[in-house]
């Protein structure tokens, strides 16, 4: 559920905010003046700004540029609505002692909504790429069979080990971003170690969205292979 007030009066603003702060996410677009007192002091003159009041006490004030807010207060902030003229929002915390006072000169709109926390899953990590390969081994090549992940060596853990259709041992090093020379060198250390301990032929494959020119040259020189991983293509897996 959500509510919207367009060009509200001071009485409407006061009633709306006092009923909803700490209960709903409130967004205000208004011409306002902002005073800050705390570890320093600042005054932001009258200008149109976006003000966000979150149920956990977070207060954020945005202007038209930059990602960072003009001012903000963290969760746990005490928020009060002062029925003065102009109407004032006071956001205060004790440790450290900081106060933001927002004088609402002209409010164009206010919205509020019951916002719930959903699941948050980061995809595109190297472990996610390894999981995708295990679920879709043909993305390496037809006939590839994954055997072991996190294979221990004296030089670190190999991301994934498997066999190709000819029975050759395949070691795979995964990178979530453009692979550098260091990734090729790491793969080659694994390759040399496995080649010394296995009688079978060994292949080394670097899996990444891309790699640098120098990394590609070294990869080819060392007889290793590269497979491009399309993060967008496989993000649904």
UniProtKB/Swiss-Prot annotation:
Pfam families, per database record: NucS_C, NucS_N
Database matches in InterPro entries: Endonuclease_NucS, NucS_C, NucS_N, NucS_N_sf, Restrct_endonuc-II-like, tRNA_endonuc-like_dom_sf
CDD domains: NucS-like
Domain of life: Archaea
Gene Ontology molecular functions: DNA binding; single-stranded DNA endodeoxyribonuclease activity
GO cellular component terms given for this protein: cytoplasm
Main localisation: cytoplasm
Keyword Amino-acid biosynthesis annotated: no
Localization annotation: Cytoplasm
Keyword terms: Cytoplasm, DNA-binding, Endonuclease, Hydrolase, Nuclease
EC number: 3.1.-.-
Alphabetized PANTHER family for the sequence: ENDONUCLEASE NUCS
Main function: Cleaves both 3' and 5' ssDNA extremities of branched DNA structures.
Annotated NCBIfam families: PRK04247.1
Family membership: Belongs to the NucS endonuclease family.
Protein known as: Endonuclease NucS
Species whose genome carries this gene: Saccharolobus islandicus (strain L.S.2.15 / Lassen #1)
Gene that encodes the chain: nucS
